[in-house]
């Protein structure tokens, strides 16, 4: 961790953005041209990594990321609130995300959840669901790390931080 991100044996500082797949007038049904425009803007900014928030993105966008050599964080739509009855859905979402995308060299990490403690207490059911997601991700793809985006108020001693390989915090300025 003290050396940062290493790519092909060399330090590779990550500078990136979080991307949602939507546009005014198109919603989530982006054309290939729109996705190419997004990539061009992201590269123009000097970014080399993208977090594909918070759901499965178009295969064409993953292909563009492969082509451009971008480092990708792909994640499932497990956001803000843990639902006891949602375990099967989160596990299915993770399996589908990995099965559909594990051949994309751009992917560096699989995201387990986003700010899941924003509206949910850290309890054993939430922890168990994250353990199962983490185990599933490693079973389906033992070559990549797992991560989760934590809300900035989460205590650094929270037991949920022990589950993924990499922890991240969303910070909101202004």
Could you tell me what each predicted segment is?
Residues 1-131, 146-147, 167:
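Active-site-adjacent substrate/metal-binding segments within catalytic domains
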Residues 128-174:
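Extracellular glycoside hydrolase catalytic/binding regions
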